[in-house]
């Protein structure tokens, strides 16, 4: 197929603009975040060392692997989440019956005594390992550790939340979340994935992702708020971070995500936080399904993919619903105010219009 020369010229210009944007904006953002990560992890490691002295069951899994920290998630340049993996689910069964959107429970196996569990005092009368009880104990230990650690002058616990959150130097927020890793399991609520008839991802990658499994996090679940569920405090939030990261390997998908995050931080960091980097990551995964071929993710296609993701984001904001990639019954906009979502839709449309109509737009963005 012959392609008009002016289209090739426009594509070449956009590739040049994208490369320049990555060098001028994306890499600067990454360097700033890397610097923050080094300090954040140094402080949190010191706090967790103190926690472990008080309570050996909470062993820090925050280890440095060639500059990468396992369990560290960047929410924004000033907000981080650190997952601490707990030991020995042991005598507990994973129960996912769909009654708790985005969540599941851990229940004592039939015939097993509480005393056989490492976490005996956090098991309820009904035999459930309570996420809230474990988090409450962990929060107390972290608060005590903050008062004793070497960085006590610059690190403070954030009050008025059941989450374990620290404020460092008054400007960085770090959430520390206890979790269990569920390898070799795949939740029933995500059993529909991947959808039949869609060629992405490749079956080998699907098998790899499902074998790797998922995490269960002890944190507040927005999907359950207001439901007055008796299970709300005992439930664990399902997390697929490793699966999502595995799916985004190859071609320019990771690069696309880095550009989206940079655009979000610079132009869509709005009141009420209606658009997060996780929303963009989710829509990127849906875009991968729409464009399954590797050639559709080469550098000359990135601008089209980003515009497609922003148009989908506008649609989600206007409908006030953004379905989770693996758990589509879970709405990632739940808890966001209609006004904040409406304002975000206007801002995203303004940004998209600039990108669609100006080949040199990235010089200003």
UniProtKB/Swiss-Prot annotation:
Transmembrane segments: none annotated. InterPro entries: Mab-21-like_nuc_Trfase, Mab-21_HhH/H2TH-like, MAB21L/cGLR. Gene3D superfamilies: 1.10.1410.40, 3.30.460.90. It holds the Pfam family Mab-21_C. It comes from the Eukaryota. Belongs to the mab-21 family. This is Protein mab-21. The gene is mab-21.
